[in-house]
Amino acid sequence: MRAGAGAAGESCKDDGVRPDDVSRLTADAVVRRVALLAVHTSPLAQPGTGDAGGMNVYVLQSALHLAKRGIEVEIFTRATASADPPVVRVAPGVLVRNVVAGPFEGLDKYDLPTQLCAFAAGVLRAEAAHEPGHYDIVHSHYWLSGQVGWLARDRWAVPLVHTAHTLAAVKNAALANGDAPEPPLRTVGEQQVVDEADRLIVNTDDEAKQLISIHHADPARIDVVHPGVDLEVFRPGDRQQARTALGLRPEEKVVAFVGRIQPLKAPDIVLRAVAKLPGVRIIVAGGPSGSGLASPDGLAQLADELGIAERVTFLPPQSRTDLARVFHAVDLVAIPSYSESFGLVAVEAQACGTRVVAAAVGGLPVAVRDGVSGTLVSGHDVDQWAAAIDGLLRSNAGAQGALMSRAAAEHAATFSWENTTDALLASYRRAIGDFTAGRRRKVRDPVAARKPRRWTARRGVGA
């Protein structure tokens, strides 16, 4: 398991290829073109709507920053409207390919496995239009993409790097009321992708441990790469100007919840906590998603039941610029999720100098420095959340509030996309070095060359 850049491991020392051979192959690896796979949600979709969230931001921003290093990036995603053009040139060196696979509308994410063959065919056809060896590496995002990624890896003879973003077993262990468990099909599919991937990229050390304990991943194949934040967009700004733009009074205390409105994200916890704090206003920025679609007005109804409807402002999903303005305007951002592989919203808020109160789950203890840039809450007890929010609000006007605000911005600055891109490229080069060494081993061992590539090492997963 590696954090950021590092030397290649020694897994090849008994296979006819010396460790220093792998190190040399890694150092010599050249990344010219990358195929990014994002089957279930487009990087061009507005975060906070449907299935769009932090992963969308991650895929798009990593592609843009790789392109700034002179690397060509093609992102493959499923077309969801007949008006989607086959190819969208997002920026120099970055294009999105909208692959037609299944109906444009009305296809639930849980039905997408039925369309993976069609999606894979579209990906392979796109590559077939180029000269052999067009892509140097495949990077799949989420397990559905990983299923297509390992097929492309074998067809193109290039390494597969995979980022899970979330794991079914982790989500199922922390289900919120009203959320349906992830199906066994996904658990099996995730195990297959973990077994097949040449390298696995995770957001945090905690996620790496989960991959190892749940899916028996090889620690030597895991790279820890923290997501980045756009520090040009998310930076400290004028609070009063932002409040005027949003119609907020200069003196009122304001808490924000930003994200998809679904049980997993627990926006109801914030409303119930704020209901215990007289005079505190809450801004909810986001749209219903997942099981939240079953009751799109549920949060507004809850505000009515709690008697705080006049203190709740609902905003649609925000563009990055508008989201930064929301962060500038509020006193703190609340993130009470039951499960969160990282928590990009937490870092974006802190980059604006806004403190965060977050659940101590998943990657949030990495995204938020407890007692320094914000507060972490263990569990989802409403009284504890009310106390945590009240404590930060009371310190707002004093020296402690200003100190935490500066600390928040300083902490967020360590999560730049430049650092993320450096770590991604290091992982890509390791994957290419290991993959090349593996192919050389096959040439030296004719018996191994006749074996299926990875099937002999596969582990089954019970439902």
UniProtKB/Swiss-Prot annotation:
GO terms for molecular function: acetylglucosaminyltransferase activity; D-inositol-3-phosphate glycosyltransferase activity; magnesium ion binding. Its EC number is 2.4.1.250. Signal peptide: none annotated. 1D-myo-inositol 3-phosphate binds at residues 40, 51-56, 109, 142, 166, 186. It holds the Pfam family Glycos_transf_1. Residues 443-463 are annotated as: Disordered. CDD domains: GT4_sucrose_synthase. GO terms for biological process: mycothiol biosynthetic process. UDP-N-acetyl-alpha-D-glucosamine binds at residues 46-47, 54, 260, 265, 318, 340, 348. Keywords: Glycosyltransferase, Magnesium, Metal-binding, Transferase. Mg(2+) binds at residues 327-328, 330, 354. It catalyses: 1D-myo-inositol 3-phosphate + UDP-N-acetyl-alpha-D-glucosamine = 1D-myo-inositol 2-acetamido-2-deoxy-alpha-D-glucopyranoside 3-phosphate + UDP + H(+). It comes from the Bacteria. Transmembrane segments: none annotated. Belongs to the glycosyltransferase group 1 family. MshA subfamily. HAMAP family: MshA. Homodimer. Catalyzes the transfer of a N-acetyl-glucosamine moiety to 1D-myo-inositol 3-phosphate to produce 1D-myo-inositol 2-acetamido-2-deoxy-glucopyranoside 3-phosphate in the mycothiol biosynthesis pathway. This is D-inositol 3-phosphate glycosyltransferase. The lineage of its organism: Bacteria, Bacillati, Actinomycetota, Actinomycetes, Mycobacteriales.
